[in-house]
Amino acid sequence: MNIQPILDAFPLPAKHGKLSDIDKDATEKAIETIIANPAEAAKALADKLKDPSTEGSDIQARHAMHATAIRIPVVDRSARKVYAEALAASLADKRPDRVKGFIIRQLQVCGGKEVVSAIGKFLTTGGLADDAAQALLAIKDGAVDEFRAALKKSKGDSKLRQNSLHGLAQLSDKSSTPEFIKALSDKDEDTRLLGLWGLSQVADPKTLEPFLAADKKETGYARNQSAHLGFKFAEKLSKKDASKVYKHIIETRKATTEKHLVEVAKAALN
């Protein structure tokens, strides 16, 4: 597919760096043409993308790909699936990471369950894991399995592990409870907080004991965050179980700077 005539409808930046001379009718027709040929157009657009460090402009291709990603879910659901699958397939080709990152971000807008496995592969790729995680969290359907698989592969990389823990916590994945509990004893503060957050998201009363035990060990910023996560946990529990959290806060927060936490806990008990 010769994509260039379609791209010519999209503006190039003026010398001062802003898009100018936008022909709305022309761009609308261009997007319609892309939607009418979603698979071929997606591949052709992906092939036009360049790494930002290389010479030449790909602004029109980026504009077209993003505009279509926004429009196609509304205009034609069947075409959306084909377009998303074609973009996802392009991730398997040899391309600069920053190009793949851009494509993944478009899938965040227009992708569905059909592309989660293609995106999930990048949860263990430094530099692309954040983009992949954000896309999967936007799609949701099928994302949990990708985060679980990535977590198993990222044991030696704290950042990648945190990325997957964050995804599983955000999705309130109950089956990941053992991983959240394991994270509570990690040497890294951020990892421990992700473990606490995960438990507060799942809100299983059976995990209150390890949650409160871990909370008691935290200091400084993590101690404050842990208390707030405790309150969130309590909001999802029965009155009886929630009271355990509030009593714990009252008993453990003795510093002047923690007075407000005690007041909140006492108010919740009454």
Regions found by a protein language model. Give the residues of each.
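Amphipathic alpha-helical scaffolding segments comprising HEAT/armadillo-like alpha-solenoid repeats
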Residues: M1-G17, A39-D51, V74-A92, G101, ...
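N-terminal, post-signal-peptide region of Sec/Tat-exported proteins
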Residues: S20-Q60
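Short inter-helical turns and helix N-cap capping residues of alpha-solenoid HEAT/ARM repeat scaffolds
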Residues: D23, S53-S57, R95-P96, T124-L128, ...
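Residue-level detector of extended alpha-helical repeat arrays and alpha-solenoid scaffolds
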Residues: D23-T27, A42, S57-R62, K100, ...
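Hydrophobic core positions within HEAT/HEAT-like alpha-solenoid repeats
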Residues: T27-I31, A46, R62-H66, A84, ...
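Core register positions within helices of long alpha-helical scaffolds
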Residues: T33-A36, H63-R71, I103-V109, A135-A138, ...
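Internal alpha-solenoid helical repeat scaffolds
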Residues: K94-R98, R105-C110, E114, L123, ...
